[in-house]
Amino acid sequence: MIFIDACLKKKTPYTPVWMMRQAGRYLPEYMKVRNEVGGFLELCKNYKKASEVTIQPVEILGVDAAILFSDILVIPLEMGMDLHFIKGEGPIFESPVKNENDLAKLSLQKAVKNLQYVYDTISLTREKLPKDKALIGFCGAPWTIATYMIEGKGSKTYSVCKKLLYTNPEFLHKILTLITETLKLYLENQIKSGVNTVQIFDSWASALECEAFFEFSWKYIIEICDFIKAKYPQIPIIVFPKGISGYLDKIYGNFDVFGVDWSTPLESASKILSAKYTLQGNMEPCRLYNKNAIKESVEQILNTMKGKPHIFNLGHGILPDIPVENAKYFIRLVQERSSL
């Protein structure tokens, strides 16, 4: 698989490419399936339909890897929290974790068992996916998942979570430890079910100052990486801590690929990290609105990463109103230009 070869810093005939959120609302085929089942969570839990939308971008766009269709918040949902997705507001937890009693109600064992629909999605997808296409499993980072569990929803300031960090760090560490232990088993089950690699998304890493990031986020990400590598050394691990360009010189750990967001210059990230890790990224997602903007960025990024281990991706997820034709153009352009 060209994607796995790139993860492991092997030479590839061209630069493999995929997009975060590639199984999503910009695709009419995805919306048709989602509307058939009734909604986002219903689609996550319907393994046959979830498998179908996982494969769609491979068939429609020609990306080099499929990423499991699911959500990072199925973890707290299946631990016992009450999750709703509300249009215009996003995910909402009716009863956020506020104290030890709330935490005691959540079950690691229950979550790992209840997530069978994810494992079934993986098994079916791996069976149907072309043999040369990688299947990416994933989870949210403990810190990012914790922000939703504690805040009850998305936040601009994360003040509830950060208040806990500075006033009761021991309790926050307890929450993060429970999430981390659950994620270890969750990713292990994804690997057993057939994923070829896993990505850990830390979407809200940028909410933390440097010292707090390494204590309350990175430490737990690396604990998960160490667990996976000890048992499955052949499985590449991708980490994506968004918005931490100022901390790159302090990054360490037992992973293979470092995801670079669009706000981080790829050239500076490469100088610090390319000797040890494959870099993934990092075109600005809004460039997909215009083919000239796509072409300019693709050429610049390929030039920057020439001769260095690289997986092409966006610097964050594709947006719902991107024209499918532009997404196809992007994938094709990367594959063609990088093969010259």
UniProtKB/Swiss-Prot annotation:
The EC code for this enzyme is: 4.1.1.37
| Keyword Disulfide bond recorded | no
Which amino acids does the record list as binding substrate? R21, Q22, A23, G24, R25, D71, Y148, S203, H316
Q: Where is this site: Transition state stabilizer?
A: D71
Name the pathway it acts in. Porphyrin-containing compound metabolism; protoporphyrin-IX biosynthesis; coproporphyrinogen-III from 5-aminolevulinate: step 4/4
Question: Which SUPFAM superfamilies does this chain map to?
Answer: UROD/MetE-like
Q: Which is an annotated GO molecular function term of this record?
A: uroporphyrinogen decarboxylase activity
One Pfam entry name:
URO-D
Which reaction equation describes what this protein catalyses?
A: uroporphyrinogen III + 4 H(+) = coproporphyrinogen III + 4 CO2
Q: What class of enzyme is it?
A: lyase
Report which residue ranges the record marks as coiled coil: none
**Cell location:** Cytoplasm
Q: Which CDD domains match?
A: URO-D
The answer to whether UniProt assigns keyword Transmembrane helix to this entry is no
Q: Which InterPro entries match?
A: UROD/MetE-like_sf (IPR038071), Uroporphyrinogen_deCO2ase_HemE (IPR006361), Uroporphyrinogen_deCOase (IPR000257)
According to its UniProt entry, one GO biological process term is: protoporphyrinogen IX biosynthetic process from glutamate
Kindly state which keywords UniProt assigns to this record, in alphabetical order. Cytoplasm, Decarboxylase, Lyase, Porphyrin biosynthesis
- Quaternary structure per UniProt? Homodimer.
Q: What does the UniProt function comment say about this protein?
A: Catalyzes the decarboxylation of four acetate groups of uroporphyrinogen-III to yield coproporphyrinogen-III.
Name of the protein this chain belongs to: Uroporphyrinogen decarboxylase
Q: Which organism is it from?
A: Campylobacter hominis (strain ATCC BAA-381 / DSM 21671 / CCUG 45161 / LMG 19568 / NCTC 13146 / CH001A)
Q: What is the lineage of its organism?
A: Bacteria, Pseudomonadati, Campylobacterota, Epsilonproteobacteria, Campylobacterales
Q: Which gene encodes it?
A: hemE
